[in-house]
């Protein structure tokens, strides 16, 4: 058996480990929603004030809240920009995988309402921290990107902008997309993505359900918002030493604040932009907090 001194040391190490985990990732929380215990991670910046925003960072299919908190690097941006970062955890589907219900064909019998879950988090967190804005932002990887599109189409009253990474617009969602008010969109997508196909899968050959190609997806939102101006410019070049040729497509109109953007990564695969890809950091922050200036 441990001596009292040794037991105390073990306890201190456990507390330190827990503290470091909370510091690096965030606070693990649960909430009962529609009779189900749901989990999420909350990271609150040191410079929080009642004008701060909430940014939801949503993991992909089979992923986890902890995983995307670690690889997205969003906590460091939250500290810099002063927003609350929230990482919701999906539920487990019939195949044993964590997911968010965006009506994939193989999850078509699921009754999980992730829109309602995230809406409840927006309201409860806004109330807890006395936030004035009462509006949130969403980004996510793959399945989390599709969830971001779903929130834009169903919850424009609570979400100010979405930034899907390797996300696609499901056909069923496009057909029912409400968009009562414009929600800015910033999509980041690789042309060599073999899971969320850049060219789409309208015939559902992969089994996820029919979804649109990325150019059609971006055009859909731009047309719905009546954004009449379009520009495409190259922002990184392999010839200049970059890992990829990256093109920035921007849709806007002079009398509307909302815009639609896409970063097309030539040869990019199904990954979240890593720390060496600094090109995604500032544009993401600008979409959330800035003026939408074209100069990146």
Give names to the regions the model predicted.
Residues 187-189:
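Short beta-strand/loop motif that positions the catalytic acidic residue
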Residues 1-14:
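Single conserved hydrophobic/aromatic residue that forms the stacking wall/gate
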Residues 57-60, 87, 264:
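Structural cue for short, hydrophobic secondary-structure segments
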Residues 89-113:
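Cap/lid segment of the alpha/beta-hydrolase catalytic domain
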Residues 191-260, 268, 274-290:
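Active-site-adjacent alpha-helix of alpha/beta-hydrolase-fold enzymes
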Residues 107-129, 150:
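Alpha/beta-hydrolase active-site loop
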Residues 60-64, 268:
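Active-site glycine-rich loops that stabilize anionic/oxyanionic intermediates
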């Amino acid at each position: 058996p441990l001596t009292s001194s040794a037991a105390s040391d073990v306890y201190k190490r456990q507390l330190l480990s827990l503290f470091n985990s909370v510091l690096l990732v965030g606070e693990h929380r649960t909430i009962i929603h529609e009779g189900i215990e749901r989990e999420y991670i909350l990271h609150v910046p040191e410079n929080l004030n009642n004008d701060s925003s909430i940014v939801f960072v949503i993991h992909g299919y089979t992923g986890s809240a902890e995983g995307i908190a670690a690889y997205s690097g969003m906590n460091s941006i939250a500290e810099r920009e002063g927003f609350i970062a929230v990482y919701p955890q999906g539920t487990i589907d019939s195949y044993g995988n964590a997911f968010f219900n965006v009506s994939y064909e193989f999850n078509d019998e699921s009754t999980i309402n992730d829109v309602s879950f995230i809406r409840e988090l927006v309201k409860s967190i806004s109330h807890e921290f006395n936030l004035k804005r009462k509006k949130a932002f969403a980004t996510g990887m793959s399945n989390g990107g599709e969830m971001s599109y779903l929130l834009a189409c169903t919850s424009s009253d609570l979400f100010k902008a979405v930034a899907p990474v390797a996300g696609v617009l499901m056909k069923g969602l496009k057909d029912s997309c409400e968009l009562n008010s414009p929600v800015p969109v910033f999509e980041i997508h690789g042309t060599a993505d073999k899971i969320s196909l850049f060219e789409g899968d309208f015939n559902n050959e992969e089994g996820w359900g029919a979804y649109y190609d990325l150019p059609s997806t971006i055009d859909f939102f731009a047309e719905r918002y009546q954004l009449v101006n379009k520009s495409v410019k190259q922002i990184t070049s392999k010839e200049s030493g970059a890992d990829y040729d990256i093109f920035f497509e921007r849709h806007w109109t002079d009398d509307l604040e909302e815009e639609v953007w896409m970063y097309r990564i030539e040869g990019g695969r199904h990954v979240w932009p890593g720390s060496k890809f600094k090109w995604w950091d500032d544009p993401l922050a600008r979409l959330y907090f800035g003026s939408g200036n074209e100069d990146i």
